[in-house]
Each structure stands twice: as structure tokens, then as C-alpha cells.
Amino acid sequence: MYCEKLRLIHIRNLDDKTIEPEKGLTFIAGPNGCGKTNLIEAIYYSSVGKSFRTANDNDMIRLGAEEGSILLTYCVHQTSHVLKIRMVRGQGKKFYLNDTPIRRKELLGLFRTVLFTPDELQLIKGAPLIRRRFLDMEISQVSPRYYETLLSYNRAVQQRNAAFRQAQLSGRKAEVDLWDMQIAKGAAYLVKKRLETVAKMDRKVPLLERYLTGEKETLSIRYVQQGEEEAHTEVEWYLTMLSQHREMDARLAHTSVGPHRDDLRFLLNGLDIAAYGSQGQQRTAILSMKLSEMEFIKEETGSYPVLLLDDIGSELDAARREALMTYLEKEKIQTLMTGTDPALAGMGTVIEMENK
């Protein structure tokens, strides 16, 4: 799988821009503010249906324009397809595959990407929600059933919480048995898939981390269920916990049990890297996890996703960059990388961007 062509019309600061990346490494060079990250953002948007920089699609549309479009041509199994995202200011967005309208849930998994940006440090330092989203997006790109179940689960949690709020207003007892069953079934499946994914990543990530650093450190990933030594995948366990917590949940109008409360923990030589790792160790750990995510997607689908590296030159030292480039070249992974110094491209193709 690889990107053949990207065209942006009225996106961010770009009026009409087309690039044709190489199958290997393409380095997007230019001064700050010229629009390098906008290209990475558009490719990622074509993959998952949203930006990694903003929750407001109006921010994507060029100032002064009423609409903007992203057109991405990708090749999979020797067949080319065209994804189009059309955004209209104040009216939302629409997705198309080969000119046929599709929904966002149908977009996920068509063209797969893995993203690494300077903000990725939040994957270790940030709130549990960031780590859950990372894991959910990874699995959703390879499993439509997982994404559907995740949507249904989140709706059931919202309905249960709404029933508690309504009961507080009416003075009546909340009827949540139906939502408890939906939540329990969804939770059991979601946690099972998460555990399977974490186990597969955990087999790869120590080897990748050692490859990048050349050191004999051991990086590992653990799935953490609040208050439990081990995560549970049984429907009956979730039903029991929801019942036991119902009185407290009713008072607080929230649901305190389930995968929406779980977390990931990253350990370096058995110690929590968020607390004990240096910033350099944390950045290398995140990159190792991103590469293990790529290996997981290849294992599940048969092909690597496209790797998007934004401003990687500021994140890694020369030795780690060289190790990364060697790995990407060896595995023949299409990579788009941004930076201000074209010398970082090595043997890759350079696309020069300029301020207008």
C-alpha cells in the first residue's frame, strides 16, 4: 500500500498543491510556515477522517475560501483508488471513494497510516484518554468490527449516564439494565481485542527499541484495568461490576467501570518510563511503539501502512535517525518526512516548499 498522488485545493495555506511521493522516502523540506505539516495532515486525514491538529474542520479550509478538498490516490494490491474529502465551511465534510459517497466508518482501513509528530510525547506524559485513542485507532484501521463495537459501546455508556441524569431530575429510579448488558458485551470484546493487540506489539517493541538505540534496554507495554491486577474479558464480570457500582454511578451520573476507564503503561527495564525515563528515552520509546504499530498492521493486513514523520529532525539524534532510515529502507516502507534541512533526506527524494 502506498500513496501515489496528493492534491490539496484550498486547504490551510495551500491554494492548489499536488505532490507525487516516491514509494520509498520522500522528504518535504522548507522553512517554517510554508505548509510542510499541512501535507502530512492531509494524508493522515485521508486515512482516518480527521485532523491530528484541530477538531474544527473549518480550520482546514483556506482563509477566504468557502470549501476545501483533499484528493488522495493510493495503490493497494496493484489497483489505484481515489479518496476525496470535501469540506464546506459551516456544513461539515463528505467522503468519497472513487466518486462514490462513503461514511467515515467505511473510510477507516482503506488507506492506512502511522503518524509520528513532536506532540507524540503526550502518549507517555498525557492523560489516559490519549493512550486509549492511540490503541483504538490502531485496531480500528485493521478491524471494522472493533470500530463498530467501540461506537456502540460509547453510545451505550452515554445512554446509561443520561438515564442517571434523568432519574436525578425526575426522582425516579433509573432503568439501566438494557444499557448494562450492551456495555458488558461491548466491554468484553473491546478489552479482548486490546489485550491481543498489546501482546502482539509487546513482542515487537523491545527488538525495535534495541535496534534504534543499540542498547540492551527492555521496553514493554502493559494494559492496565483500574483497580485490577489483570484485565477481564468476561461479560458476566462486567455485569457484576456495573451492578455493584450502580448506586455510586447513579449519584455521579457516570459509568465508572469499562474500557473507557482503562490505560496503557510503558515500562523501560521494568520501570514506568513516564516517571523514570529521560525525555530522549521517552521519544525513542514512542517511535519504537509506532514502528511496532506498523508491524502489527502489516501482520494483520499483509502490507505496511504509510509512515508520516513530522519534524523528525528535532526529535531524534543522528544515530537514531540513521537507524530509523536503515530500517525503513530495509522494509521498503513508504515514508513522508518533513523538516527544514534537506540533508536529512539521505537517499530519499526531496520536495521543496516555499513561503508565499
Language model features: what each stretch is:
Residues M1-P31, S170-V306, E315-A319, A323-Q334, ...:
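Conserved NTPase motor "head" modules and their coupling/switch loops across ABC/AAA+ ATPases, GTPases
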Residues K36:
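Conserved lysine of the Walker
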Residues Y44:
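Helix-to-loop junction immediately C-terminal to a conserved catalytic motif
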Residues S47-I124, P128-I130, I139-V142, Y146, ...:
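Nucleotide-state sensing region of NTPase/ATPase domains
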Residues Q78-T79, R86-G90, A319-K356:
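C-terminal lobe/lid and adjacent interdomain/linker elements of RecA-like ASCE P-loop ATPase modules
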Residues Q122-L123, I130-S170, A174-D177, M181:
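Long, charged N-terminal accessory/stalk domains
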Residues D310-I312:
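Walker B catalytic acidic pair
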